[in-house]
Design a protein with these regions (language model features):
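Active-site helix of classical SDR
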Residues: 119, 156, 164
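Canonical Rossmann dinucleotide-binding motif of NAD(H)/NADP(H)-dependent dehydrogenases/reductases
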Residues: 1-31
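Substrate-binding pocket helix/loop in short-chain dehydrogenase/reductase
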Residues: 95-96, 100-108, 191, 203
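C-terminal substrate-recognition "lid" of short-chain dehydrogenase/reductases
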Residues: 176, 212-241, 246
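Residue(s) in the substrate-gating loop at a strand-loop-helix junction
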Residues: 140
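Active-site loop-to-helix junction immediately N-terminal to the catalytic Tyr of the SDR YXXXK motif
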Residues: 99, 146-154, 166
Length: 250
């Protein structure tokens, strides 16, 4: 990925940070984009400390003007964008009857609507690239298998999978590829508060590898799907990195 530029939305977080490091170590220049200035700066410092070219831009993906500003600043800093990774996410643990419309709308605004608008803005730029571009949208195993207490999150992630495949179909002829990774259970900011002892036991019983994933274990799939060489004939692919969760019948 030498000479390529990747914008990582949600890049200051645990999963996004691992993806930023993985792509950077493969030679890409990284733009860390997240909602918090301090978190972005800390992530960039970590990346730079291991020799990765990295910069940052604060973004709120629920506001289109902020997304447009991210693209503008990224182009000013790097001259182009070859890869877009959508890794921002919001979750909340409630029973179905306790999901109110405000919570539902808030989760969908980040997980699906924000992702859709980000793809729109960046695809317009990628269409000007001679080599097109690659998009990686982070989904979830909950888009495929039901899980209690994450109803809005799961529904939004099912939308992410569908959106990704529609983008892939729409822009394949213009050399823009879109794929999705659906992680299994990776402890991160948005789900740690949901992982009580009983829930962890149930999840491990349903995961054949009987352990959580490490953020670094998403990197291989990301490199494959974003690579112009290794993933050149892959678009609309949904890759589950889940320790076997989606193939298990408990």
């Amino acid at each position: 990925m030498e000479g390529e530029v990747a914008v990582i939305i949600g890049g200051a977080g645990e999963l996004g940070g691992a993806l930023s490091a993985g792509l950077g170590q493969a030679g890409a220049r990284i733009v860390v984009a997240d909602v918090g200035e301090d978190a972005c700066k800390r992530r960039v410092e970590k990346l730079q400390s291991i020799g990765i070219q990295a910069s940052h831009c604060v973004v709120n993906i629920t506001e289109r003007a902020s997304i447009q500003n991210l693209l503008t600043e990224s182009l000013q800093m790097t001259g182009k964008v070859d890869m877009l990774v959508n890794c921002a996410g919001l979750n909340a643990g409630t029973s179905f009857l306790d999901v109110d419309t405000n919570l539902w709308d808030k989760i969908f605004a980040v997980n699906l609507k924000g992702m859709m608008e980000t793809c729109q803005v960046f695809i317009e730029s990628m269409l000007k690239n001679p080599d097109g571009g690659a998009i990686l949208n982070i989904g979830s195993v909950t888009s495929e298998r039901p899980l209690s207490r994450v109803f809005a999150y799961a529904a939004s992630k099912a939308g992410v999978v569908n959106l990704t495949q529609n983008i892939a179909q729409e822009f394949a002829a213009q050399k823009i590829r879109a794929n999705s990774i659906c992680p299994g259970f990776f402890p991160a900011e948005q789900n740690r508060k949901l992982l009580d002892e009983k829930r962890v036991e149930n999840i491990m019983n349903g995961t054949p590898m009987r352990r959580y994933g490490s953020p670094d274990e998403l990197v291989g799939a990301a490199l494959l799907l974003l690579s112009k060489k290794a993933g050149s004939y892959m678009t609309g692919s949904i890759v589950y990195v889940d320790g076997g969760f989606t193939c298990s019948w408990f």
